[in-house]
């Protein structure tokens, strides 16, 4: 009985060792064929990323080496600082123009300030040039309006002239047509009466009379 049990146990151990060996071989094949290639490609990708971002590393290192020189450090070293140029123009208090009555200088008759006005290349002040430009603009506008008024007046006169001439021509034509008519009207007898009017009435033929004309025959 003991020998049978020993052989049975030996067989079971052998079977278990074989299963373990097969499992180990499977794991080895899985690691070498599937896992190691992926790890290799991952390492290569990481190396490429590191090489590509190396310039960032150098940039940050160089920026860390920058030394900012302050005014106190320069003064302690005995150097004289030059005045810094400002981006904004400086405004003098004398030329400030605020909306107050006291700070405006006296104005002359032409409306130009007599003092404190900036001058131009021609010698006049800027405000004076501005007022002169405004005056010239107003003069040009006035002259243009005056020209338009004159044109309207001339056109109105021409229109009236042609209307009056047409009316006089029509009246003259009416008179000519009336005088050229073959039938002449005789004015009625006035209350006082004149010899000329009676003579004209006597010369007129009465209705129903026959008028004979002398005709010469060859």
From Swiss-Prot:
Biased composition (Polar residues): 109-131, 172-181
Extent of Low complexity compositional bias: 182-193
Originating species: Kluyveromyces lactis (strain ATCC 8585 / CBS 2359 / DSM 70799 / NBRC 1267 / NRRL Y-1140 / WM37) (Yeast)
GO (cellular component) term, any one: cytoplasm
Subcellular location, record wording: Nucleus; Cytoplasm, Cytoskeleton, Spindle; Chromosome, Centromere, Kinetochore
Primary role: Component of the DASH complex that connects microtubules with kinetochores and couples microtubule depolymerisation to chromosome movement; it is involved in retrieving kinetochores to the spindle poles before their re-orientation on the spindle in early mitosis and allows microtubule depolymerization to pull chromosomes apart and resist detachment during anaphase.
Family recorded in the similarity comment: Belongs to the DASH complex ASK1 family.
Region feature (Disordered): 109-218
GO biological process: cell division; mitotic sister chromatid biorientation; protein transport along microtubule to mitotic spindle pole body
Subunit structure: Component of the DASH complex consisting of ASK1, DAD1, DAD2, DAD3, DAD4, DAM1, DUO1, HSK3, SPC19 and SPC34, with a stoichiometry of one copy of each subunit per complex. Multiple DASH complexes oligomerize to form a ring that encircles spindle microtubules and organizes the rod-like NDC80 complexes of the outer kinetochore. DASH complex oligomerization strengthens microtubule attachments. On cytoplasmic microtubules, DASH complexes appear to form patches instead of rings.
Main location: nucleus
UniProt keyword terms in alphabetical order: Cell cycle, Cell division, Centromere, Chromosome, Chromosome partition, Cytoplasm, Cytoskeleton, Kinetochore, Microtubule, Mitosis, Nucleus
InterPro entries: DASH_Ask1
A family per Pfam: DASH_Ask1
Protein name: DASH complex subunit ASK1
